[in-house]
């Protein structure tokens, strides 16, 4: 099916282009979301008449997205999740979780705007892409941790494995000290 794009669509084309897409993609995605019109003569004529208005509208939304992008780019958001000692999450962090974290910080980001390169299934810092407008894309960081204190430590550059190793070393040291004290006490007797 041939359609006229009303806005830029990733991996498809720019606004105003007539492109050939599969019928299901057009019927189920492009047409219902208002991203395209069927490419027949009447729609082409009406699009040409509205083209200047649509371009102005697109430019306005792009400016708004760029203003939000300026504030949002490079931001870090904390997501608290329960995890095993090795750092593997019980479940995963989804686009909804990322959108909620950004919304709690005062940004209006929908879960459809979040793009995860891969599922987030472990603790740590993860870079996530946010598409605010088809032409405005920013990167944010999700700090996935078990607690706020752990998130602060991760943000300062320490990994979960380093923290676990430090805790284990401290526990071993305390046990060794305890045995030394017990040994010294038994020698005194």
UniProtKB/Swiss-Prot annotation:
PROSITE patterns: RIBOSOMAL_L9. GO terms for molecular function: rRNA binding; structural constituent of ribosome. One of its GO terms (biological process) is translation. Coiled coil: none annotated. Transmembrane segments: none annotated. Keywords: Ribonucleoprotein, Ribosomal protein, RNA-binding, rRNA-binding. It comes from the Bacteria. InterPro entries: Ribosomal_bL9, Ribosomal_bL9/RNase_H1_N, Ribosomal_bL9_bac/chp, Ribosomal_bL9_C, Ribosomal_bL9_C_sf, Ribosomal_bL9_N, Ribosomal_bL9_N_sf. It holds the Pfam family Ribosomal_L9_C. GO terms for cellular component: ribonucleoprotein complex; ribosome. Disulfide bonds: none annotated. The keyword Transmembrane helix does not apply. Binds to the 23S rRNA. Belongs to the bacterial ribosomal protein bL9 family. This is Large ribosomal subunit protein bL9.
